[in-house]
A protein has these predicted regions:
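Conserved hydrolase catalytic core segment
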Residues: 110-149
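Short beta-strand/loop motif that positions the catalytic acidic residue
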Residues: 229, 235-237
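Acidic catalytic loop of the alpha/beta-hydrolase fold
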Residues: 240-244
């Protein structure tokens, strides 16, 4: 684990693998700490010949919390967006993309292969739009170029009231993970419970999640901007994602010229171990392709 100043804030990060290998920057999603990229997943990715960087986004985990910016009403922001009204955010996805670039700067990387999941995929999209020179490839996992309404009962997972007790918070995390899973892979409740408990013990900061949600909504529709992206791109999406619906994956792939779209049958909004071979093969193949294309003749 390490900590650096990037874009004027503090970011907590961890690196796996050999610094001589191609660098992958993993960007995680809404309210999710870097530990949502499991250690075993990162080690397997590093074992395939990559240097892997995971980190806590601003306002979550052990990175800088932005409480001085005030509380956010994420449901009001969603309502405004659905009504076509402007949304005022404490910070933006562009700011979060700048955080990622600042982390690369702090660690001495001119560019990296960018991998983002969910909101992390949205940040990754914003990064390759705003900072194309810093990206060698883009992998977008269960993400979307714009806000596409999902089932309100599924979205409500992110606005459940705080149970107020440790066990209540753990159970809510388990229930939320079950609701957003796709049903095509085994749901290991004991494993999920241990993971949720460890994350709560590491950091509990729902106020940051609310501000991140408003940042998502405020960024609007990136579709037209993505048409200018000229990078090797892979889009991975579960066929049964109830939160970021499959349409989001299709629209991402359609917006980026030459993007490859891989559907993972039965996967929801999750990274189940049973899907890792497909995900790891996809990322590794894309990185190898990009490295070959960028090698001197």
């Amino acid at each position: 684990m390490g900590r650096v100043t990037a874009n004027g804030i503090e970011l907590e990060y961890e690196v796996f693998g050999d610094e001589a290998d191609p660098t992958l920057l993993l960007i995680m999603g809404l309210g999710a700490q870097m530990t949502t990229w499991p250690v075993e997943f990162c080690r397997e990715l590093a074992g395939r010949g990559h240097q892997v960087i995971r980190f806590d986004n601003r306002d979550i985990g052990l990175s800088s919390h932005m409480d001085h910016l005030g509380e956010a009403d994420s449901m009001a922001a969603l309502g405004a967006a659905m009504a076509g009204e402007a949304v005022d955010a404490a910070y933006t996805l562009a700011d979060m993309a700048d955080d990622s670039v600042g982390l690369l700067d702090a660690l001495g990387h001119d560019a990296a292969h960018i991998v983002g999941a969910s909101m992390g995929g949205m940040i990754a999209q914003r990064l390759v739009i705003n900072h194309p020179e810093r990206a060698l490839s883009l992998t977008s996992i269960f993400s979307t170029p714009r806000f596409i309404p999902a089932d309100p009962e599924v979205v409500a997972v992110f606005n459940w009231p705080d149970p107020g007790t440790l066990e209540g918070r753990i159970q809510a995390g388990v229930d939320g993970a079950r609701i957003t899973s796709g049903g095509g892979f085994p749901f290991d409740e004991d494993l999920v419970r241990r993971y949720v408990a460890a994350n709560i013990d590491r950091s509990w900061h729902p106020e940051g999640q609310a501000r991140q949600m408003v940042a998502i909504v405020a960024d609007g529709d990136r579709t037209e901007e993505l048409r200018s992206v000229d990078l090797p791109t892979l889009v991975l999406h579960g066929t049964h994602d109830p939160l970021v619906v499959p349409q989001g994956g299709q629209e991402t792939a359609d917006a980026i010229v030459g993007a490859e779209l891989v559907w993972i049958d039965g996967m929801g909004h999750e990274l189940p171990p049973g899907a890792w071979p497909t995900i790891l093969d996809g990322i590794s193949g894309l990185v190898a392709e990009a490295e070959r294309a960028g090698a001197p003749a």
